[in-house]
């Protein structure tokens, strides 16, 4: 194992800490992945916090604390945001302390939230809480690179663009930075969180404060979602919400993408995945090294009755795999990207600096004007994607892996686990092993009734779908550790299916295209023709639609029905005009009957009206967004890293 791998094996899941200080464990640093921050990101600035209390001045000049209102957190716009954007955003700090307590601001700890309201009104109002992993990684990873409505324009000098297929198309998204010291969250030093039950209690307190300020969201279905090490956060938070009486929002389910949930089965799955996809030749010396590390791991497991969240004796397996991929290309050392094995990266990063969006996101979120717009100015230091000190202090020595909570949770709520098939760090084979060894609802693993069903989005293969007894597993095709980054329309379809949202009544981009699991009917909706361009064609994208069973109907049936409806409406309009003309003639208003040009104009206006969508009353920019063609490269865009020797270099192109 190289010295770099020894110091950074744990960076991956949590993302990017390439030179962490006194690493508590190798694997955490790979989960985290970010460069270390020596800045005081957990230290508040000298300004007065406006999160849990709002400061006002009375007539005597003395400052008085008042409870904040929703308007205090409103974000009219962000620097660089499109001028015609109709997003409704709120952001700011909320205390991690219990809602019925008051602590001096300089002694309190604060989480940061970023609320993106739903663009369309769905049949089921939903609030999604999103958490990124780490420990210590900001949820702006999810917001600005995966499921949020805004993206940075690469090398665009801080310019943002609005995207379709965001998860707030049909659900309200609440991104949270936690635990203390993560992203824009802050608190006095030292005040780091060490255990999962503490982090979940802090989140419950923050959510209780959020619902007090935004009470309308407490009536909505509540879901918690995230990825990577959030596979530990999310089940713990779900159980805490079910156990508490200070949050009345109905928790309906959780979603975890490429999650670190069951350490034992995840570690043991590494060799299987590496051999299966060809990262390591099973007959090579590299395979011997991998198997040596696997033996150390299994010996530790067999001799210990407890299961920590990270097992030191098992962390050499991943290092042996990544070390075996190091090659020299054009005088530069290269290795595979552990988050997307289709790609390569410069050694020893091996994916730690991926995706390339971070080069723009990091300076943007450190800008003073951006902090002010987000009401985050009380976080004094520059924004850091993943704070090393948070992860190094999150020991979790007494916390059991979150997989132990699954049987009880599955008795009460739905759980969706999704895995990008190109991820190594939290490979899908580990999630599948976990399910096979999990006992819930009276049975271990899947029963014979549960089968892998092919999942298609707009006619293209999107992955496999399997569900039974409140558990859904989705293997997402052509996707990395950050699946929504690679296939946004596909993962949006996954979301609306799991939430039970009827996009045909909510409109929006997902209503334009088709989605199908197994033998479901694939229904096309919003089949309209504008400027001779037919929307709803097969291509990259998705729809989460009201699902029925039966054969797929012929497209001609829909076209014939649409034509009949159109002719009927035109006939009604013409009949109405004829009736009005006769009535006016009878009443002596003959002038109307002698102006055929006016008559023609009325007919044309009504003819055009029948080609508009149900949302034609929306402002033009909103309508344009709904009728934009769906991108066709959603399923095969690999987002190659800029450090590759050439734009077409993948791991498979390296000499072996």
From Swiss-Prot:
Membrane-spanning segments: 560-580
A Pfam entry, by short name: Peptidase_S10
Entry EC number(s): 3.4.16.6
Residues with attached carbohydrate: 58, 304, 458, 470, 478, 531, 559
Ranges in the topological domain labelled Cytoplasmic: 581-656
Gene3D superfamilies: alpha/beta hydrolase
List of catalytic residues: 228, 423, 481
Enzyme class: hydrolase
Highest taxon above the source species: Eukaryota
Biased composition (Polar residues): 1-11, 644-656
Feature: compositional bias, Low complexity: 34-60
InterPro entries to which the protein is assigned, alphabetical: AB_hydrolase_fold (IPR029058), Peptidase_S10 (IPR001563), Ser_caboxypep_his_AS (IPR033124)
Topological relation to the membrane, as annotated: Single-pass type I membrane protein
Record keywords: Apoptosis, Carboxypeptidase, Glycoprotein, Golgi apparatus, Hydrolase, Membrane, Protease, Signal, Transmembrane, Transmembrane helix
GO CC, any one term: trans-Golgi network
Catalytic activity, as annotated: Preferential release of a C-terminal arginine or lysine residue
Region (Disordered): 1-79, 608-656
Subcellular localization(s) per the UniProt record: Golgi apparatus, trans-Golgi network membrane
GO BP, sorted A to Z: apoptotic process; proteolysis
A molecular function (GO) term: serine-type carboxypeptidase activity
Function of the molecule: Protease with a carboxypeptidase B-like function involved in the C-terminal processing of the lysine and arginine residues from protein precursors. Promotes cell fusion and is involved in the programmed cell death.
Family, per entry: Belongs to the peptidase S10 family.
Protein name per its UniProtKB record: Pheromone-processing carboxypeptidase KEX1
Native source species: Puccinia graminis f. sp. tritici (strain CRL 75-36-700-3 / race SCCL) (Black stem rust fungus)
């Amino acid at each position: 194992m190289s010295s770099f791998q020894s110091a950074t094996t744990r960076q991956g899941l949590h993302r990017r800490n390439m030179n962490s200080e006194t690493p508590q464990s190798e694997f955490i640093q790979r989960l985290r992945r970010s460069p270390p921050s020596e800045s005081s990101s957990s230290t508040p600035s000298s300004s007065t916090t406006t999160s849990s209390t709002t400061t006002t001045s009375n007539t005597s000049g003395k400052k008085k604390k008042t409870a904040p209102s929703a308007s205090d957190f409103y974000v009219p716009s962000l620097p660089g945001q499109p001028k015609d954007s109709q997003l409704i955003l709120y952001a700011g700090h909320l205390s991690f302390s219990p809602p019925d307590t008051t602590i001096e601001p300089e002694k309190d700890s604060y989480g940061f939230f970023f609320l993106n309201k739903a663009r369309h009104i769905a049949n089921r109002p939903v609030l999604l809480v999103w958490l990124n992993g780490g420990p210590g990684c900001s949820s702006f990873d999810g917001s600005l690179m995966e499921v949020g409505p805004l993206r940075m324009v690469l090398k665009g000098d801080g310019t943002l663009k609005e995207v379709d297929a965001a998860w707030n198309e049909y659900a309200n998204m609440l991104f949270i930075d936690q635990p203390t010291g993560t992203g824009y969250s802050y608190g006095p030093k030292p005040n780091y969180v060490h255990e999962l039950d503490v982090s979940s209690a802090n989140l419950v307190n923050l959510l209780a404060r959020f619902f007090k300020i935004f009470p309308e969201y407490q009536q909505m279905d509540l879901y918690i979602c995230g990825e990577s090490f959030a596979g530990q956060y999310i089940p713990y938070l779900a159980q805490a919400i079910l156990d508490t009486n200070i949050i009345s929002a109905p928790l309906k389910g959780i979603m975890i993408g490429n999650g670190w949930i069951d350490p034992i089965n995840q570690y043991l799955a590494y060799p299987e995945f590496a051999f299966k996809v060809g990262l390591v030749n099973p007959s090579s010396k590299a395979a011997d090294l991998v198997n040596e590390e696997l033996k150390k791991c299994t010996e530790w497991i067999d001799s210990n009755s407890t299961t920590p969240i990270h097992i030191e004796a098992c962390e050499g397996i991943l290092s042996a795999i990544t070390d075996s991929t190091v090659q020299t290309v054009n005088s530069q050392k290269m290795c595979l990207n552990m988050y997307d094995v289709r790609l390569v990266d410069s050694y020893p990063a091996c994916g730690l600096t991926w995706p390339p969006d971070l080069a723009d996101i990091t300076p943007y979120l450190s800008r003073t004007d951006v902090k002010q717009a987000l009401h985050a100015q009380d976080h004094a230091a520059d924004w850091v994607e993943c704070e090393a000190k948070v992860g190094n202090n999150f020991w979790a020595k007494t916390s059991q892996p979150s997989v132990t909570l699954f049987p009880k949770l599955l008795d009460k709520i739905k759980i969706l686990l999704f895995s990008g098939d190109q991820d190594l760090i939290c490979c899908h084979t580990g999630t599948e092993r976990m399910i096979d060894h999990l006992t819930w609802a009276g049975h271990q693993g899947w029963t014979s009734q549960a089968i892998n069903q092919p999942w298609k989005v707009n006619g293209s293969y999107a992955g496999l779908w399997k569900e039974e007894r409140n558990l859904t597993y989705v293997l997402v095709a052509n996707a990395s550790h950050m699946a929504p980054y690679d296939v946004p329309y596909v993962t949006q379809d996954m979301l609306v299916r799991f939430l039970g949202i009827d996009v045909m009544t909510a409109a929006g981009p997902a209503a334009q295209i088709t989605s199908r699991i197994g033998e479901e009917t694939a229904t096309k909706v919003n089949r309209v023709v504008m400027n001779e361009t037919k929307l709803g064609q097969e291509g990259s994208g998705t729809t989460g639609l009201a699902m029925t069973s039966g054969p797929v109907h012929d497209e001609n049936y829909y076209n014939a029905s649409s034509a009949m409806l159109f002719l009927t409406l035109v006939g009604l309009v013409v009949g109405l005009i004829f009736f009005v003309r006769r009535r006016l003639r009878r009443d002596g208003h003959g002038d109307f009957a002698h102006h055929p040009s006016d008559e023609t104009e009325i007919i044309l206006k009504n003819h055009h009206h029948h080609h508009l969508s149900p949302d034609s009353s929306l402002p033009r920019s909103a309508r344009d967004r709904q009728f934009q063609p769906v991108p066709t490269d959603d399923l095969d865009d690999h987002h190659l890293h800029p450090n590759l020797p050439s734009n077409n270099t993948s791991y498979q192109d390296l000499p072996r």
